[in-house]
């Protein structure tokens, strides 16, 4: 079902559970869903858009610390880390996800890409957001949350970010 079918409003999030939200989802289905998200990120030029913003903000002589919340297979974080490294940035990239299988896929993705990104398990809705990052992102995740959870998470992200 199209999540916007009834409302016709592209600004309204669909809070319905997705296949990937099932903790009992079979491994091959979960990996297939992660590959699908990677395709979405590729087609929508997610890394390119984030990179453009980081290049506006960042100083190539400075260290950039990036945190990707609900990182899934880590494709956005790894691509961003590699693109910044190629441009001379020193990058510390860290991704968090609640799913051990997604984290395993993210680590493998980083290894294959020659990325120094690291990953850890975290329930970003209920857990403590790691501090000490300059740039915090979350791609294709917030639509899962209620308005109240989004506001709470964004506030906790702002509190954890190094601002300067």
Locate each region found by the language model.
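Short helix-loop-beta connector
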Residues: 58-65
């Amino acid at each position: 079902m199209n999540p916007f079918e009834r409302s016709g409003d592209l600004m309204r999030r669909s809070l319905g559970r997705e296949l990937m939200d099932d903790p009992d989802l079979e491994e091959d289905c979960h990996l297939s869903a992660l590959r699908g998200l990677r395709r979405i990120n590729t087609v929508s030029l997610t890394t390119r858009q984030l990179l453009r913003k980081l290049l506006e903000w960042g100083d190539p002589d400075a260290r950039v610390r990036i945190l990707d919340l609900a990182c899934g297979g880590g494709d956005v974080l790894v691509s961003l880390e590699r693109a910044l490294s190629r441009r001379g940035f020193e990058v510390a990239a860290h991704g968090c996800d609640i799913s051990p299988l997604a984290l395993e896929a993210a680590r493998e993705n980083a290894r294959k890409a020659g990325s120094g990104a690291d990953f850890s398990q975290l329930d970003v809705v209920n857990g403590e957001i790691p501090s000490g990052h300059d740039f915090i992102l979350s791609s294709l995740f917030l639509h899962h949350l209620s308005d109240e959870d989004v506001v709470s998470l964004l506030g906790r992200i702002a509190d954890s970010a190094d601002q300067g």
